[in-house]
């Protein structure tokens, strides 16, 4: 990759020399070294390097002759390497790994517009792994096109097939043996794998999603690393892609995939996690969230929380400045939804120690590691007897974003701090006091500010552990009045005679900002089992602001009153009064000017504290959550009461229906018994009727047979008593039946 000419510092050009007839040098003392063969003279054989080239190579003889010609006849230009074409004029020589002389500047070769190879009169050596030449008279790392072409510098000039080099390799042969998918265990996770030619190959996109997604910017970065590491992944065939889609290893719309062996994946993983895998590359610099370039990242609904007031516009101590820069970096990374790389601390710290000018000029980089490194550097390079440093805004940063540094930490405080300089939260962990229903952006910003406060308080407490308790601490910072139009800090020109070098405590907000006790007694990090975040939320009012300028006379009295105040406030906040303390918390510093001891680095343009505003917002959210919980509880109680009443009504109705059912069953039993009796009586009447019918038939036959009147008279006389008896008996039976029927009708009407 060619570096733009605007970024290259101007180097002194050497006037063109007359042509020299030797091939050992082209401009007096200029020597060209190729990364392919390390010989200044052109070589006839191909270089011993691997990898395809971009175009079909020219014949070796012609390439060598053109290289030799360029080496011999280029006035003021560096000689080309083996198989590479030399530049002419002020453009420098081409890289030795390229077969086409016209591509010399395109593939890591030569200087740019300043004669990186040939314009200098000093010897030039090519960097390892690339054929770019850098002028030794220029110490800038951007004077040669170095880092981006290391993968293409090892190109081969041997005869290759005519197809382009960057075409996709042929996929795996579509055979049943190659298409057999298995789920294997890789670093504790199940990954899809295929066995191709006896080698186990795992799915690269799935492994990227599981292990590399939080380490690099994207899958394209992984492919760039694979090219640099000379690892060629295997291309899946159509059947393997279909199987991987069915397993969920790749997304439904993806129609291509690549496989990689376990060994190559371990190499890739180590390259992604190892900071030393990028030699010569400058550290990445993450911009602040509030910078104009990243303004599109912030949501428009939170202008108050993320206004430039988060970045302190006035004087800070080294600890508070580093903490503010670290918090801005944490917010930036959280808003980008990208985890912080663990190797950033060591890499950036080493980079800042090498380039100390940026740190000493006040360039508080917004990346976490850089802020830690610059804080350490300021602490180490500033003796304790130093008064104060005048902050100088870096040229690349706006004036409002420059973080000035007051007096340094003393050696006791510095020795107590962690090696990286800060106790930084690398991940945004959920907090029990923030409602789950908040938008993600609000939760992220609230967590960032709370971690910011926790970091400042932890550093203050850590510094206090090593300092004597009887020490009188004074601040050398004159706090800027809130209505000051200038964002630059106002520092004292000298120190008072009796003051000691110490870290000015940037305290968090208190429930009574007017109190100005001494800051020599720092609060403990944990008290009564509560974390620092809970105390900073306003649950404990013993977090005190810093001292005033003239507060030295009342030091002892303030010391005793604060001790009594802490003893009063040591009641456990896990009791039900914690809710009342949240409700009764009132931040009284809204309408009045803040005292000088209040942390003015966090002032908004309208004079309000950003921390105070944030805590007020969080308090309002908590109140809303509590009110919602109470309303829901009342609603649940009402619903319970209604359900209970419905249940009682249903129970009464059920009991009534059960009673009615029992009565109906009893009536049914009685009716069935009566029906049986009626059936029996009917059967008896039927039998009696049949008997009478038979007797009547017999009598009629007898009457027909009797001819004489005597016989009829005698028969009549004999039958009369029987007929009378039968009539009386039949009449009695009929009356009984009628009586029973009347009784049945009466009972039926009753029920």
Curated annotation (Swiss-Prot):
What highest taxon heads this organism's lineage? Eukaryota
Q: What is one term from the GO cellular component aspect held by the record?
A: nucleus
Per the record, what about its domains? The DACHbox-N/DD1 domain forms a structure containing a DNA binding motif similar to that of the forkhead/winged helix domain.
Subunit: Interacts with SIX1, SIX6 and EYA3. Interacts with NCOR1 and HDAC3 through its N-terminus. Interacts with SIN3A through its C-terminus. Interacts with SMAD3 and SMAD4.
The UniProt record lists the keyword Hydrolase? no
An example Gene Ontology biological process: type B pancreatic cell proliferation
Biased-composition ranges, Low complexity, are 20-53, 61-74, 120-156, 499-517
Localization, per the record, is: Nucleus
Record Pfam families: Ski_Sno_DHD (PF02437)
Q: Which family does it belong to?
A: Belongs to the DACH/dachshund family.
Q: Where is the composition biased (Polar residues)?
A: 167-178, 285-294, 351-369
This chain's source organism reads Mus musculus (Mouse)
Mind telling me what this protein is named?
Dachshund homolog 1
Annotated region DACHbox-C: where? 609-689
UniProt-annotated stretches for the region Interaction with SIN3A: 620-699
InterPro entries (alphabetical): Dachshund_domain (IPR052417), DNA-bd_dom_put_sf (IPR009061), SKI/SNO/DAC (IPR003380), Ski_DNA-bd_sf (IPR037000)
The biased composition feature labelled Gly residues covers: 75-97, 107-119
GO MF annotation terms: DNA-binding transcription factor activity; DNA-binding transcription factor activity, RNA polymerase II-specific; DNA-binding transcription repressor activity, RNA polymerase II-specific; RNA polymerase II cis-regulatory region sequence-specific DNA binding
Q: Which residues form a coiled coil?
A: 623-711
Interaction with SIX6 and HDAC3: annotated segments: 182-377
Q: Which UniProt keywords apply?
A: Activator, Coiled coil, Developmental protein, DNA-binding, Nucleus, Phosphoprotein, Repressor, Transcription, Transcription regulation
Region spans: Disordered: 1-178, 273-295, 351-393, 467-525, 537-556
Region (DACHbox-N) spans which residues? Answer: 182-268
């Amino acid at each position: 990759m060619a570096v733009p000419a605007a970024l290259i510092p101007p180097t002194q050009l050497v006037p063109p020399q007359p042509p020299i007839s030797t091939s050992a040098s082209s401009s007096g003392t200029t020597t060209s070294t190729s990364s392919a063969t390390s010989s200044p003279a052109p070589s006839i054989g191909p270089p011993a390097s691997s990898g395809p080239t971009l175009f079909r190579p020219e014949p070796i003889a012609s390439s060598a002759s053109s290289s030799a010609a360029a080496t011999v006849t280029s006035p003021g230009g560096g000689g080309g390497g083996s198989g590479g074409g030399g530049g002419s004029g002020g453009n420098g020589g081409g890289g030795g790994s390229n077969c086409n002389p016209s591509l010399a500047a395109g593939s890591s070769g030569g200087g740019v517009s300043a004669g990186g190879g040939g314009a200098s009169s000093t010897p030039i050596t090519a960097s390892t792994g690339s054929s770019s030449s850098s002028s030794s008279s220029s110490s800038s790392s951007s004077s040669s096109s170095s880092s981006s072409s290391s993968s293409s510098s090892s190109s081969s000039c041997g005869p290759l097939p005519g197809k382009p080099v960057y075409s996709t390799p042929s996929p795996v042969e579509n055979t049943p043996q190659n298409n057999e998918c298995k789920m294997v265990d890789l670093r504790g996770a199940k990954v899809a794998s295929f066995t191709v030619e006896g080698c186990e190959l795992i799915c690269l996109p799935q492994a990227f999603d599981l292990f590399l997604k939080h380490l690099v910017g994207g899958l394209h970065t992984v492919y760039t690393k694979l090219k640099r590491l000379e690892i060629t992944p295997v291309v899946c065939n159509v059947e393997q892609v279909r199987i991987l889609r069915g397993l969920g290893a790749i997304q439904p719309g993806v129609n291509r995939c690549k496989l990689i062996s376990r060994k190559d994946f371990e190499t890739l993983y180590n390259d992604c996690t190892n900071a030393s895998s990028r030699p010569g590359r400058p550290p990445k610099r993450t911009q602040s969230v509030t910078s104009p370039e990243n303004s599109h990242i912030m949501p428009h609904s939170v202008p108050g929380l993320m206004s430039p007031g988060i970045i302190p516009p006035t004087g800070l101590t080294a600890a508070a400045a580093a903490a503010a820069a670290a918090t801005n970096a944490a917010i930036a990374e959280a808003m980008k939804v990208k985890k912080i790389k663990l190797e950033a601390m060591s890499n950036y710290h080493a980079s800042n120690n090498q380039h100390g000018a940026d740190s000493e000029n006040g360039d508080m980089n917004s990346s976490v590691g850089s802020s830690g490194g610059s804080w350490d550097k300021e602490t180490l390079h500033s003796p304790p007897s130093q008064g104060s440093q005048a902050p100088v805004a870096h040229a690349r940063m706006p004036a409002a974003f420059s973080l000035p540094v007051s007096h340094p930490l003393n050696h006791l405080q510095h020795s107590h701090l962690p090696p990286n300089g800060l106790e930084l939260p690398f991940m945004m962990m959920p907090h029990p006091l923030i409602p789950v229903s908040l938008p993600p952006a609000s939760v992220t910003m609230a967590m960032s500010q709370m971690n910011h406060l926790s970091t400042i308080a932890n550093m203050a407490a850590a510094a206090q552990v090593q300092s004597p308790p009887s020490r009188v601490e004074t601040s050398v910072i004159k706090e800027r009045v809130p209505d000051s139009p200038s964002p630059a800090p106002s520092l004292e020109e000298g120190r008072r005679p009796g003051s000691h070098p110490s870290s000015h405590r940037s305290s968090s907000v208190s429930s009574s900002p007017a109190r100005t006790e001494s800051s020599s007694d720092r609060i403990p990090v944990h008290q009564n089992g509560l974390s620092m975040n809970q105390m900073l939320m306003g649950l404990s009012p013993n977090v005190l602001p810093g001292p005033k300028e003239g507060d030295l006379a009342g030091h002892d009295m303030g010391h005793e009153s604060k001790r009594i105040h802490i003893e009063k406030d040591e009641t456990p906040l896990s009791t039900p009064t914690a809710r009342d303390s949240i409700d009764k918390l009132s931040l009284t510093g809204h309408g009045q000017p803040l005292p000088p001891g209040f942390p003015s680095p966090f002032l908004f343009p309208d004079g309000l504290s950003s921390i105070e505003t944030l805590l007020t917002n969080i308090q309002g959210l908590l109140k809303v959550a509590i009110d919602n919980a109470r309303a829901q509880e009342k609603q649940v109680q009402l619903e319970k009461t209604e359900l209970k009443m419905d249940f009682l009504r249903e129970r009464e109705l059920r009991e009534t229906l059960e009673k009615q059912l029992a009565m109906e069953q009893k009536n049914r039993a009685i009716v069935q018994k009566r029906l049986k009796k009626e059936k029996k009586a009917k059967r008896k009447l039927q039998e009696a009727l049949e008997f009478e019918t038979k007797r009547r038939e017999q009598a009629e036959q007898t009457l027909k047979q009797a001819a004489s009147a005597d016989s009829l008279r005698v028969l009549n006389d004999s039958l009369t008593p029987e007929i009378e008896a039968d009539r009386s008996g039949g009449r009695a039976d009929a009356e009984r039946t009628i009586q029973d029927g009347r009784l049945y009708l009466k009972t039926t009407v009753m029920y």
